Structure formats: C-alpha cells, structure tokens
Design a protein with these regions (language model features):
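Alpha/beta enzyme core
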Residues: 1-47, 51-62, 66-152
Length: 152
C-alpha cells in the first residue's frame, strides 16, 4: 500500500509538494493507493489501475492541539463506489477526546460497507497527546477489529 493521505491534515510534506509528479511514477510498485478523493482525482492519471483505499474521514489539522476533535465523514460509501474504491479508510482516535465520535464513524462505515461489499480499513491515529506504546496499539487494534473493521 502506498499511502499518501497525510496532506489533508499536515499540508505539503517535503518531497510531496507536487503529488502529481511524485506519486504517479511510484504507482507501479504498489498494489493499493490510499489517499483522499481529491488527491486521487487530481494526481493519479486514468491509465493507472491500482486498487484504491479511499480516505473516507476528515480530521482537524495539525494546527489544533487535539486533532481528534475534528473527526467526521469526508466521503461516504457512494463516493467510494463512484471512485471504484476497493476499500475505505476510517481514522479512529483511541484515547483522544474524539474517540467516541470516531468509533461511531467507524461503525457506520462498516454497516455501509457491508451493504455494498466494500471492506473498511480501521486506521489507528496516534495524535500529539497519545503515546506510541505496545499497550496503546494492542487496545486500539483490538477495538477496531471488534467493531467490525475488515483490517487494521
């Protein structure tokens, strides 16, 4: 998986300022491209036929101290179908102020995904206030899996 979905919260990352120039040549080395619909539509040529994992949530930017407070649906399952996405990615903030809302978003995406046969990738977000510990990842991955994420 080539994931280039970080710009929607971080802005341009060094080396990825021009995704249309940087990402397209890398596509042949990846099975799946994970990005927002805007990045896919504007940067991936129609001749590229990789599977797509559509970033389906939006979050607060890095300018906000607690990024988990901005979580919501950025693209619904019908948008994923129009984009011919093979899966959707839902970010969850375990331990953050927006945990409950992000988990509800995950559950709703799982329900919609099951209706249309589209799997849901549960993404664990480690924000500024969260530690990247084994305990955190064990809890986060277990919660996302038990709530129905197809993969984490």
């Amino acid at each position: 998986m080539l994931a280039f979905d970080h710009g929607y919260i971080m802005g341009a990352t060094a080396g990825l300022e021009r995704m249309d120039v940087t990402i397209a040549p890398l596509c042949r080395y990846a099975d799946v491209l994970m990005a927002t619909r805007g990045a896919i539509r504007s940067c991936i040529p129609p001749t590229v036929h990789n599977a797509i994992c559509l970033r389906a949530t939006h979050d607060a930017s890095v300018l906000i101290d607690d990024m988990s407070t901005g979580n919501g649906v950025g693209a619904d399952m019908e948008a994923a179908i129009r984009m011919n996405a093979s899966a959707v990615a839902i970010q969850c903030f375990i331990g953050g102020a927006g945990e409950a809302r992000s988990l509800e978003t995950l559950c709703r995406a799982v329900d919609a995904g099951e209706r249309y046969g589209i799997p849901v990738l549960g993404v664990t977000a480690v924000g500024k206030e969260m530690a990247r510990t084994t305990q955190y990842f064990l809890l986060a991955t277990r919660m996302l899996a038990e709530l129905g994420a197809s993969f984490v």
